[in-house]
C-alpha cells in the first residue's frame, strides 16, 4: 500500500500532570486474564502510569511497557483488559497519574483463559454477518491488501500472509486502525483452525511483531502482539468457539457493537480467515 492514512500514534510514556488526586480508591478486580494477573504481580517496586482516559475505559501504561485496559463489569474487551467492580469516578484519574500494584485488589478475581482453543468451527463461515466497516478497508488499496491476506492464508504461504498483514498494520485511523482490526480477526481464525502454523514460521511472525511495535498505535500494538501469542478478547473468542449458526450470529452482533467500526473490521478479518482456511482444507 503506497498511500496510507497516518495512524494516530499515542506516546509510550505520558508526562505527569502538575496536580494529581491525593488518593485513588482501591480498584476491586472482578475478572482478568491469567497473563494480566501475572503482569500485575510482577516487579511490584515499579510504577505504571495512566495512559488515556475514556468514558468507559482507562488505559494504563504498565511497568512492562504495555497497556492494561480497565473497564467495568462484563466480558473482557481486550486480552489485556481488567474488569473492575466499578471504574474510578470521573475526574479522579488523569493521564500521567501514577498507579501501582497495591491500587488493585484482585484477591477474589476470576482468572479467565483468553487463549484461543484450537478446533473445528461449529458454524458455517457464511453464517457470519457482513457489515460495512471503515472506509479504509473498502478503498482500492484496502481491498487489494485484504485479498492478498486471504490468498496467503488459503495457500498456506506464511510469507504472503505476513506481506499482506504488514501492509494492513497501521492502515486507517483511530485508536485501532481498520487494517489492524482486520489482521487481528484473521489471526483469530488462524489460531482456531491452523494452530501452530504461524508459530512454525518464526521469521514471518517476527516481521508481524516488529510491524505492530513500530507502525501503529499503542493500543493496536498490544492487541496484535497478544493475537500473535494466541490471546484474544472474550467477544472474539465467543465468535470462533460458537457451536451453531444461531450462536455465532449472536456473538457477531456483540462484536459489531464495539467501537465505531472496529467490530465490523474485526469481523471482516474473522470471516476472511475462516473462508480462506476452509478453501485450503478443500484443496487437500
Residues covered by each model-derived region:
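Phosphate/adenylate-binding glycine loop and adjacent helical scaffold
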Residues: 11, 15-164, 168, 174-179, ...
Amino acid at each position: 500500500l503506497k498511500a496510507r492514512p497516518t495512524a494516530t500514534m499515542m506516546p509510550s510514556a505520558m508526562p505527569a500532570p502538575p496536580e494529581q488526586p491525593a488518593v485513588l480508591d482501591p480498584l476491586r478486580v472482578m475478572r482478568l486474564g491469567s497473563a494480566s494477573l501475572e503482569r500485575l504481580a510482577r516487579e511490584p517496586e515499579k510504577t505504571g502510569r495512566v495512559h488515556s482516559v475514556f468514558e468507559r475505559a482507562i488505559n494504563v501504561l504498565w511497568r512492562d511497557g504495555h497497556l492494561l485496559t480497565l473497564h467495568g463489569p462484563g466480558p473482557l474487551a481486550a486480552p489485556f483488559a481488567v474488569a473492575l467492580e466499578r471504574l474510578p469516578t470521573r475526574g479522579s484519574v488523569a493521564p500521567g497519574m501514577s498507579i501501582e500494584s497495591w491500587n488493585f485488589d484482585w484477591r477474589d478475581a476470576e482468572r479467565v483463559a483468553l487463549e484461543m482453543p484450537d478446533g473445528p468451527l461449529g458454524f458455517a463461515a457464511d453464517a457470519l454477518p457482513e457489515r460495512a466497516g471503515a472506509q479504509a478497508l473498502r478503498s482500492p488499496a484496502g481491498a487489494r491488501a485484504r485479498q492478498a491476506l486471504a490468498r496467503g492464508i488459503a495457500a498456506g504461504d506464511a510469507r504472503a500472509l505476513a506481506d499482506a498483514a504488514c501492509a494492513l498494520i497501521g492502515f486507517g485511523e483511530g485508536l485501532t486502525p481498520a487494517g489492524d482490526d482486520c489482521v487481528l480477526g484473521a489471526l483469530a481464525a488462524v489460531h482456531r483452525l491452523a494452530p501452530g502454523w504461524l508459530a512454525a514460521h518464526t521469521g514471518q511472525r517476527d516481521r508481524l511483531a516488529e510491524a505492530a511495535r513500530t507502525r501503529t498505535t499503542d493500543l493496536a500494538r498490544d492487541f496484535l502482539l497478544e493475537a500473535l501469542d494466541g490471546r484474544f478478547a472474550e467477544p472474539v473468542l465467543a465468535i470462533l468457539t460458537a457451536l451453531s449458526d444461531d450462536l455465532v450470529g449472536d456473538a457477531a452482533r456483540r462484536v459489531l457493537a464495539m467501537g465505531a467500526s472496529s467490530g465490523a473490521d474485526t469481523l471482516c478479518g474473522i470471516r476472511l480467515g475462516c473462508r480462506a482456511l476452509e478453501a485450503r482444507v478443500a484443496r487437500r
